[in-house]
């Protein structure tokens, strides 16, 4: 995934109403998942929640796991592990990119 794709997916621009339409979840469910620390929307100065496309995907995953009977505490643990793995992958990719840049600069 390119940096532009990542920033596009993670940009928090959608209101809870749009997220509700995209996911089929109620506003109450979305707020509940936030309260259970499964989701972390940004807030505007006036307190309006803003969500990203990544948040929508995360909500769909949460809803699927809930439907499978998984407890929110277990989902939180799973999501934390996924988030950590994603961060580690990003760091690794940045390190590799830095090594490639350094290698090609030496060749010039």
UniProtKB/Swiss-Prot annotation:
Superkingdom assignment: Bacteria
SUPFAM superfamilies attached to this UniProt entry: Putative DNA-binding domain
Entry-linked Pfam families: MerR_1
PROSITE patterns linked to this entry: HTH_MERR_2 (PS50937)
Keywords, ordered alphabetically: Activator, DNA-binding, Repressor, Transcription, Transcription regulation
Expression triggers: Under conditions of nitrogen excess, repressed by GlnR. Under conditions of nitrogen-limited growth, it positively regulates its own expression.
Known DNA-binding region: 16-35
Tagged with keyword Coiled coil: no
Protein's GO biological process: cellular response to nitrogen levels; nitrogen catabolite activation of transcription
Assembly mode: Homodimer. Under conditions of nitrogen excess, TnrA forms a stable complex with feedback-inhibited GlnA.
Summary of the function given for this chain in its UniProt record: Transcription regulator that actives the transcription of genes required for nitrogen assimilation during nitrogen limitation. On the contrary of the MerR members, which require longer DNA sites for high-affinity binding, TnrA requires a DNA sequence of 17 nucleotides as minimal binding site.
Protein name per Swiss-Prot or TrEMBL: HTH-type transcriptional regulator TnrA
Gene that produces this protein: tnrA
